[in-house]
């Protein structure tokens, strides 16, 4: 299990770094936000993967049985990783409507993402 989530995180980093965010129809705010994350994306993905692993270990359920709520989801990268790692249901919540639009676009580009 640990290897799968960490492997998914590494693969996702490659996918996300390959995206030209400046060409996407997303807000300037989100372009700046993601541009600041991009150089340290591997670092954050490792943290996200570790959080998912610790959560799964403490709950003791299989990933497919879990609902993860990404409250204040920002870039949505945690939501994408959770879904890619096999979490059953992923709910993304952010008060910024531009961030919600961005995660919808990213979900199409990487072929996975939050359910809501």
Q: What is the role of each PLM region?
A:
Residues 1-116:
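Conserved N-terminal segment of class I S-adenosyl-L-methionine
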